[in-house]
Amino acid sequence: MKNILSIQSHVVFGHAGNSAAEFPMRRMGVNVWPLNTVQFSNHTQYGHWTGCVMPASHLTDIVQGIADIDRLKDCDAVLSGYIGSPEQGSHILAAVAQVKQANPDAWYFCDPVMGHPEKGCIVAPGVAEFFCNEALPASDMIAPNLLELEQLSGERVENVEQAVQVARSLCARGPKVVLVKHLSRAGYHADCFEMLLVTADDAWHISRPLVDFGKRQPVGVGDLTSGLLLVNLLKGEPLDKALEHVTAAVYEVMLKTQEMGEYELQVVAAQETIVTPICQFTAVRL
C-alpha cells in the first residue's frame, strides 16, 4: 500500500487542508501520514478563527522522528499545501530531501496555496515568493489555480492556449506534471469548471458543470483535488484517466454538499462516490 506524507493545514471544525484531503485519500486506498502546518478552529473564510501556526522546527522534528524509526523509506510521496510561513516552507523542502534520500523514487507534489483575499484565504508575507523561487524547482508535480499559475510564471493568462503554454514553461523549471486546478476566466465556458493537466509533451482539458452555492463557495476543493490526483497517479493511473476520476469524484462531493444544504465539504457522506463516481467526464487531449 502506498504512503503519503501530507503536510498541510488542519481545521478542527469543517474541511480544509488535511481535514479535506486526508479521509478521501485513505478511502481511495492509501496510507496518509498527516503533518499539520497550522491548527485552526475553522478555515479563514469565516472571518474569525483561533489556533496557531506550528513552529517550523515542529515539522522537522516530526519527520526526524519517522526517520529515527527507519520508516521514511516507506514514504512514496510528500504532498504539501497551505503553509503558515516561508520558514515552514524551507523545512518542508528539507523534509522532501530527507524522504528522497531514504526513497529516491518518492515524489513531491506541491499545492502552492498563495492566498486569495477575496475568498478569505490569507497567507503570510514571503509565502508566495517561497513557492515561486524554491518549491517550484523542487517539485515533481505542482497544482496551481489560475491566479497561482500567473504568480508562478509572472505572466497574464487569458485563454486555454496561453494556460497550456505557461504551464509548459513551469515544466521547464522543475515539475514534470502541472495541474491547473481552475481555469476560471481563461476557460472555454463561463458556466463550467475547467481544469488542465499539462506535461512537456501532452496536455488534457476537462470540464464539469459548476455547482451553485451562491456567493460563498466551499473551501477545500483544491486540497481535495490535489490529494485525489496524487493518489490516482501513485496507483499507476494514466494522466488522462486520473484527471477524469478526480473531476468526477470532486463533482460528486460538491453535489452531495449542495444536496445536504451544507457549506463544508461533505466528504464522509460522499465517500462511496469518491471511490466510484456516478457522473463521468472525459479528458480531451489538446
UniProtKB/Swiss-Prot annotation:
InterPro entries documented for this protein: PM/HMP-P_kinase-1, PyrdxlKinase, Pyridoxal_kinase_PdxY, Ribokinase-like
Cofactor: Mg(2+)
EC number(s) reported in the record: 2.7.1.35
Cellular component per GO, a single term: cytosol
Catalytic activity: pyridoxal + ATP = pyridoxal 5'-phosphate + ADP + H(+)
Signal peptide residue numbers: none
GO biological process: pyridoxal 5'-phosphate salvage
Disulphide-bridged cysteine pairs: none
UniProt pathway: Cofactor metabolism; pyridoxal 5'-phosphate salvage; pyridoxal 5'-phosphate from pyridoxal: step 1/1
Binding site for substrate: 9, 44-45, 223
Keyword Acetylation attached: no
Binding site for ATP: 111, 143, 148, 181, 208-211
Pfam families found in the cross-reference section: Phos_pyr_kin
UniProt GO MF annotations: ATP binding; magnesium ion binding; pyridoxal kinase activity
Superkingdom as given in the UniProt entry: Bacteria
Top-level EC class: transferase
The entry's keywords: ATP-binding, Kinase, Magnesium, Nucleotide-binding, Transferase
Function: Pyridoxal kinase involved in the salvage pathway of pyridoxal 5'-phosphate (PLP). Catalyzes the phosphorylation of pyridoxal to PLP.
Alphabetical list of NCBIfam families matching this protein: PRK05756.1, pyridox_kin
Self-association and partners: Homodimer.
Record-stated family: Belongs to the pyridoxine kinase family. PdxY subfamily.
Protein's recorded name: Pyridoxal kinase PdxY
Organism encoding this protein: Yersinia pseudotuberculosis serotype I (strain IP32953)
Gene, per the UniProt record: pdxY
